[in-house]
Every structure is written in structure tokens, then in C-alpha cells.
């Protein structure tokens, strides 16, 4: 599953053990294999969209109190918070689209008093020039509200949405 670890130290240890065993270890980031995500990646890479102006990525989900009754959920030792447990798939998608992050600023907190953040907002600037926001929360009332990625470019705007980014709008 994902992510490989919650800290850089743990990641180095995992890497060391994998190398020693002569094995391969791959996290599961299935958005890269989503046909619509792959299509957007192709449009970006081909230059068809022109210069990327901005993106917005929203992961607005619900994880009710029952979810947090499971002993490791919401703990700093095992969970890592909304960026690790829910939004890491979308962080990976942003890396897939735009490459390495150049700079970032963010705010977050635990609105319900957990050891980890349950809501986060970040501004990300990528070396490729793409700039945008990532908003993630598990504090939406009653049920998941939206998973949405909007890309504003010189020659088009794209929105991926739906439960599994299975809807696309292009204009």
C-alpha cells in the first residue's frame, strides 16, 4: 500500500532492506493507470494544452467517528494523516503530471483532535512551472463530497471528477 513510510528515516530503512534482499518494492498509486488521468498526462506532455497556468486538486472526503475507532487511525505512529492516508494518491498524481516540487507552503490541523492532520491546504510550485493548490480533508459532513482536479492551461481547461476521477470535462 502507500506510502512506504511516514518518515524519511523509515523510508531509508525500507530501501536498505529491499536492496539487501535483492527484491523490488512498489507502492500502489493506481491513479497513474486511470485512463482519464493517463489521457491528461499525454495532453500535458504533448504540449497540446500549451503553458500550464494553474491547477486545483480537491480531496473532500468523509471519515466518520466510526472510522477513527480503529486503533491505528488518527495516530501519528501508524496513520500519518489525510495527506498520507487519503490524499497521497493525488500528491502522486501531481508529481506524475508536473514532475518535482520546487516549493510548497501549507497549513493544516486536526479539527477533531486527532494526533494527525485531518484537513490540509497547500500551495505547490513545480520545477516545470505548474503552480496550484491541494486541499484535502476527511471532515466533510456525512459522506464523500468530491475528488476533483482542475487544470487551467493556455489552450484549454480540464476537470477530472467523479468518485474515481472517472469523469472528464474539457473546454
Residue ranges and their predicted role:
Residues 12-15, 40-43, 68-72, 118-121, ...:
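Short, glycine/charged-enriched secondary-structure capping and boundary segments
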Residues 31-113:
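Predominantly a Rossmann-like dinucleotide-binding segment in NAD(P)-dependent oxidoreductases
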Residues 85, 91-167:
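Contiguous beta-strand/loop segments that form the cofactor/metal-binding neighborhood of enzyme cores
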Residues 22-24, 53, 128-130:
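Short, well-ordered coil/turn segments that N-cap beta-strands
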Residues 1-32, 47:
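Beta-strand-loop-alpha-helix segment that lines the small-molecule cofactor/substrate pocket
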Residues 7, 61-67, 142-143, 159-161:
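A short beta-to-alpha transition loop/helix N-cap that caps and shapes the active-site region
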Amino acid at each position: 500500500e502507500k506510502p512506504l513510510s511516514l518518515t524519511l528515516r523509515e523510508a531509508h530503512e525500507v530501501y536498505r532492506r529491499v536492496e539487501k534482499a535483492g527484491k523490488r518494492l512498489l507502492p500502489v498509486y493506481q491513479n497513474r493507470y486511470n485512463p482519464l488521468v493517463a489521457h491528461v498526462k499525454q495532453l500535458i506532455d504533448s504540449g497540446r494544452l500549451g503553458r500550464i497556468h494553474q491547477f486545483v486538486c480537491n480531496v473532500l472526503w468523509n471519515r466518520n467517528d466510526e472510522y477513527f475507532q480503529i486503533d491505528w487511525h488518527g495516530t501519528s505512529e501508524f496513520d500519518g494523516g489525510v495527506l498520507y492516508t487519503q490524499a497521497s494518491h493525488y500528491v502522486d498524481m501531481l508529481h506524475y503530471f508536473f514532475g518535482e516540487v520546487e516549493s510548497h507552503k501549507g497549513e493544516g490541523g486536526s479539527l477533531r483532535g486527532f494526533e494527525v492532520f485531518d484537513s490540509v491546504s497547500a500551495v505547490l510550485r513545480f520545477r516545470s512551472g505548474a503552480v496550484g493548490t491541494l486541499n484535502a480533508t476527511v471532515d466533510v459532513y456525512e459522506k464523500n463530497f468530491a475528488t476533483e482536479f482542475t487544470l487551467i492551461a493556455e489552450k484549454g481547461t480540464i476537470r477530472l471528477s467523479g468518485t474515481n476521477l472517472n469523469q472528464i470535462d474539457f473546454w
